Amino acid sequence: MVVRKEKKSRKYRGYRTHGWGTKGQHRDRGAQGGRQIGMHKEKWSWTVKFGEGWYGKHGFRNPTSKLVNAIGLRKLQEYIDNDKIKIEEENGKKVVDLAKYGYDKLLGGGNLRLPLVIKVAKATEKAKERVKEIGGEIILTSSE
């Protein structure tokens, strides 16, 4: 028996692009939202308003520089007071291990009120002096 069914696609027969304009226009992703246009001409108003520092040279990041996470004595005392840094007891001494809290270096700004044994990778001379003055000690954990 003959199947009576309309053709699936019978519109625009003989019309090369089926109503989608120039060849290939229906095939791609549409307009690209201004990614390909020049900021100096077509999008100048945006560049003036939001694009500060868009043009010109802007330095570089030194690849050999090492970030040091440091803490001063003033901030250390503040964190101890607020229980952000806990004091541990070892052999009857109060010990703070700064490496456990992510600090690499102890700076000498400010003062401590407690004689502490502080374990840290690096410390400034001023920090060493101030900790010794109140009866504390700094144990350097790195070999540098």
UniProtKB/Swiss-Prot annotation:
GO-annotated molecular function: rRNA binding; structural constituent of ribosome
UniProt entry tagged with the keyword Ribosomal protein: yes
Superkingdom to which the source organism belongs: Archaea
InterPro entries in alphabetical order: Rbsml_uL15_N (IPR027386), Ribosomal_uL15 (IPR030878), Ribosomal_uL15/eL18 (IPR021131), Ribosomal_uL15/eL18_sf (IPR036227), Ribosomal_uL15_CS (IPR001196)
Gene Ontology CC terms, in alphabetical order: cytosolic large ribosomal subunit
Alphabetized SUPFAM superfamilies for the sequence: Ribosomal proteins L15p and L18e (SSF52080)
Similarity section: Belongs to the universal ribosomal protein uL15 family.
Function: Binds to the 23S rRNA.
Protein name per its UniProtKB record: Large ribosomal subunit protein uL15
Phylogenetic placement of the source organism: Archaea, Thermoproteota, Thermoprotei, Sulfolobales, Sulfolobaceae
